[in-house]
Structures are given as C-alpha cells and as structure tokens.
Amino acid sequence: MSEVVIKEQLEQYISKIERLEQEKADLSQEVKDIFQDASSHGFDVKAMKSILKLKKLDKDKLAEQDAMLELYRDTLGI
C-alpha cells in the first residue's frame, strides 16, 4: 500500500471518529435536556435513571435482583 493510500485511510478513520464523537456529545446533551425537562415537570430523575437501568436487565436477572433486595430489606427491617 502506498503512503498516500495509508494517509487517506487514516484521515478517513480519524474523520469518522471525530464525527461520531460529536454525535455522541450531541446525543448526551439531548438526554440531559430530556431529564431536565422531566424534572421541571415534577418527575424524579434519579428514579427514571434507575428504571432505565432495570429495563436493560433480562427478566431473570431482574427477578433475582428484586428477590435479593427484598431479602435484604426484610433482614434489616426496612
């Protein structure tokens, strides 16, 4: 491969990564804005983030986590 081709490929990779990093930053800001809007309408952002994490778990893992949490709460009288 010639140096020109290698340079062009490298520039393309770098350009793609930079574009994706900017898109990621833009999306992150949009998510923050949505949480801020939800908060201004009285929603609990911390609870919403917890729900989002729980939704990522498969049903068996979620049931296992719920059972363990209930056991610990019962043990501690909470």
UniProtKB/Swiss-Prot annotation:
InterPro entries: GapR-like, GapR-like_DNA-bd. GO terms for molecular function: DNA binding. Belongs to the UPF0335 family. This is UPF0335 protein A1G_00885.
